[in-house]
Amino acid sequence: MSNDLKKTPLYDRFVESNAKIVEFGGWAMPVQFSSIKEEHNAVREVMGIFDVSHMGEVLIEGKDASDFIQYILSNDTDQLTDNKAQYTALCNDKGGIIDDLITYKLDNQKYLLVVNAANTEKDYNWINSHSENFDVKVENVSDQYGQLAVQGPEARDYVGSLVDVDVSEMKPFDFKKDVTIFGKNIILSQSGYTGEDGFEIYCNSDDVVDIWDGLLENENLVPAGLGARDTLRLEAGLPLHGQDLSEDITPYEGGIAFAAKPLIEADFIGKEVLKEQKENGSAERTIGLEMLDKGIPRTGYDVLDLDGNKIGVVTSGTQSPATGKGIALAIINRDEFEMGREVLVQIRKRQVKAKIVKKNQISK
């Protein structure tokens, strides 16, 4: 593994834990601590903790901040209220997804964008290059932040017992500023990437080790790596940029149409393409797949009709720890979509039966 990889402040903790470290988006990150299945099940059944300090943070502030983010982001940022976050995307002129991200409204003139680690520099440069006609300051503040995710059925009660605010009524994408945990100031967000209840904790990068150590005083909290994070998000039908989303895929094609604006008067990047797809539909759409026969669908495998004609491609796939079955997200021709339809996945030299299912495959 290259010595040039970036490391989060928790890297030494990973080494001490004998975690398996891999390269991810230019970072040295733990793929697993014990086993992917154990960590996955801990999050589904009890709770787990992830270091996500590799994620990027871009701060936008100034008199025109609200107008600027409405211009550059796919979702309707006028719907943002204080202490509310929003899932959204940066789109290019063709509606393609440069990145998917979370926007936090800190106040009327200050917004924090949390972007994917591998895209941080690209996103920052792109955002900054479109800011010249707005009275805003765009700053890459990624080095200032640490981020932890505590996820699972017991996460709310546990985190709630440690902070100085009431979390019992927090709903998805609610957040609270100036929260204290272990004497440290944090932003507490009711969000995650697992399909479970839980929180994401944003803190000063100098505080993340102390908060990690403090949280792990509870033996029921299990450290989890990128492997479990991937199987959890795939079961939940949550896309990963670079696989399920890309600059050639629009929100309507990528299964995140809810993150595209309604038809508003204001100008925004990608408006014409997104407007046309909203009114007339896109040529392709993202689906969930469940394998009916033995086999694990992987990124790039062709999806075929029962006559062997190609109708799409797998964008992400794995074996579900919950069911033992192969599951996937795939993008197919819209005309070929029918819920429950049987299809084939070309797995090496075999054509293996699967069926179209909901993207979220968590059995609750």
Swiss-Prot record:
Reactions catalysed, as given in the entry: N(6)-[(R)-S(8)-aminomethyldihydrolipoyl]-L-lysyl-[protein] + (6S)-5,6,7,8-tetrahydrofolate = N(6)-[(R)-dihydrolipoyl]-L-lysyl-[protein] + (6R)-5,10-methylene-5,6,7,8-tetrahydrofolate + NH4(+)
One function term, GO molecular function aspect: aminomethyltransferase activity
Keyword tags: Aminotransferase, Transferase
Keyword Nucleus carried by entry: no
GO biological process, one term: glycine decarboxylation via glycine cleavage system
EC class: transferase
Domain of life: Bacteria
InterPro entries, per database record: GCS_T (IPR006223), GCS_T_bac (IPR022903), GCST_C (IPR013977), GCV_T_N (IPR006222), GcvT/YgfZ/DmdA (IPR028896), GcvT/YgfZ_C (IPR029043), TrmE/GcvT_dom1 (IPR027266)
Cellular component annotations (GO), alphabetically ordered: cytosol; glycine cleavage complex
E.C. numbers: 2.1.2.10
Keyword check for Transferase: yes
A Pfam family recorded for this sequence: GCV_T
Similarity comment: Belongs to the GcvT family.
HAMAP family (alphabetical): GcvT
Function, as annotated: The glycine cleavage system catalyzes the degradation of glycine.
Subunit and interaction comment: The glycine cleavage system is composed of four proteins: P, T, L and H.
Record-given protein name: Aminomethyltransferase
